[in-house]
Structures are given as structure tokens and as C-alpha cells.
Amino acid sequence: MNVVSCAGKSLGVLALCYASHAAALANNAIVTGNQSDTYYRIGEDLKQYAMPELRNLTSKGAVDNIKALSKTAGVSFAIVQSDVYQTYVNLEKNDPDPAVREWASDLLHSLRVIAPLYNEEIYFIVRKDSPMQELQDIEDKRLAIGPDGSGANLTAKNIYYKLFGKAPVVVKPFIEAGVLGTDEGTKYSRSALWHLAHPEAGPEERKADVVVLIGGPPLPLLQRLGKDYKLLATNIKNDATEALLKDYSIGFADQKNYPFLPKHMPVMMVQSYLVTAQFRDKQRNDFVKKFAGALCQNYEKLQEHGHEKWKALTWSPANPRLPSLLSGWSYSTVTKPILESCAPTATTSAPIAAATPSSLPCSMEDRAIGFCQ
């Protein structure tokens, strides 16, 4: 119900009308990521092309998004990496605080997927002259994985624990003097990469052996990497690496996207999910239903005008059956019937060409820290 529809009502009805509108506004947020993230741009697309009343909220990453969905008033949707589920399984089983274990358990029983979005590649970057060649070589190395709450931090810790049964040695995030970026996360990554290429520079506590980056390909930061860097290969060769396939899949980093690669390289991939929760409030569930309907009705707009990652969506009105999910996850019983009964429109959208590495500008800042060939 919008404000305009409240006009002409009696005072009593008018009060109820505006109260209903205020309640609707209170439930209309999606939490995504920082403003340079693809997650944030996906949220902006949903607001612009599907649901104008949607508020797109910034965050530090996947863990923060889940916390916001469970604890922040008004947040009805979030975008997260699929392996965030395992983080809360670990909390439920192992946290020493009973209140945290109970909260994690309630959260796991409430989280629901609206739709899988796209795969993100997981990159383990080292110096070109490093003896490390593949993922299994990172044991006991110093990892730069970004701040607590970020997707890279969560995923790196999860992968490391599954491989070696212990926590990694983590380099505390820092920002090197003179390093620029649109947000702190970008500055952290650039600073860690700079120290990776300049191992003799700066204080000891800022030295990293491996920098972990995650994103949907092509990742602009990687497109600019120069000859001082190399990517560790992901090879499935033992029970520990095979166990990773419960939460992840294997893909290939394309040498055409990343000129510093000598060839296509096998990498781990994690899915990104658009999620909601099992809400008790009827008005909030009505808003979730409205959101699913808007996604159905405006699919073509998202495909034609939105971020290129919308083209990776496996669900579509022409193929409305939702794909199977990774272990532990379930679809929302509110949104699934709406999406799976969605019918295609008569229009089609032309593909949008992705930017190529050669078309990306190379700033002085990038050149100064060893980026760009």
C-alpha cells in the first residue's frame, strides 16, 4: 500500500493506512556489500529495475549480511556466499557460549534461498618466485584474507580448516600509505598485494605469503596484475581436497581474462545466493512474495540493463525450475512457488559485451604496485 492510496480516508482508517505503509517501509531492505562489490551492484539493479522501494544497504561481506538479516530491523534479503552456512554450523557445534550456539541454530533453521546467482572464483595469489605451486602448499603460510566478516575471510578460513584441520596464520588487514581505493576492502587487497611483490619493504607484521581474493570473473583487480605474481592451482589429489567439493566446485581461471596467467588455471569456486528467512510476520512475508513477483516480472529488464552477472542466473521464466542447492540449504517456501510458476515474456534481450583487459585503464597507482603488464 502506498501513501497516495491513503488519501480521502477517515482519520481512523487513515491512521491504519499510514501505519501499514510505515510497516512496509520497515521491511524493504537488502544487505549486499561495499559499493565496489558486484553484490552491491546486484542490489542496485534490483532496486532500479525490479523494486524501486527496495533499500540497498552496504556491508563488510557475507558474515555481516547474515547477521544483518537475523538482527537488523527491516532487512528482508541478503546476498551471501554459499559456504557461509558452514560457518554457522561450526558456531552451532563449537562455540563456547550457549547463547551463540542457540542463535546459530535458530539462524540455520530460518535461512532460505530465493535463487542462486552466479559462481565466484577463489584466487590464492603468491609471488612469481614462490616455491608454492598449488593450494595444498599454503599450510603454515601467512594469509592476507581481509577483515573479519568479509567473504574472503570466511572462505579462506573454511578452506584452510578443511585442508589442514586448524586455523590459518592471518595477517591483520592494513592500508599502506599512498594506496587508494573506493573502499577499505579494496585498499586492504591492494596493500597486501603490494607487500607480496615487495617482501623487503615495510614492517614485519604486514608481510604476507598468500593473498586470497574472491569474486565473479573477471575480477578487475586480477586483470591488472603484472609479472611479479602467480596463481596457485587447485588440484583434487587427496581426501582433504576432495572433501572441499561438498561446499565448493572446480572451475578454470581464464587466461584471456588475466594476462599474468601462463594458461587456464584450475581454481575453487563458491556460489553466491540471494537469500531471505522464514519470517513470522505476515506483512514481511507479503513483502517477500511481492519481491519474488517483481523478480519474475522484471527478469528481462535485469538481463538487458543490469550487471552482466545476471546472465549467469540458472533460473529464468523460460526455465523456471530452480536448481538443486548445496548441502544444508533450502529454498524459501514463500518465493519458490512464485518463481517456479513464472512465465516468460515475449521480449528477448541482447547480450552485453564484457570489458576486456585491454580496455581497462592502467592508473599510475596500479603501475606503482606492480599491476598491469
For each predicted feature, which ranges?
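An extracytoplasmic/periplasmic, membrane-proximal ligand-sensing/linker region
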Residues: 190-194, 198, 205, 210-211, ...
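A structural signal for short loop-to-beta-strand junctions that line the ligand-binding cleft
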Residues: 102-117, 257-266
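N-terminal signal peptide c-region/cleavage motif recognized by signal peptidases
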Residues: 17-21
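Ligand-binding clefts/hinges and TM-proximal coupling segments of bilobed small-molecule sensing domains
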Residues: 141-159, 248-321
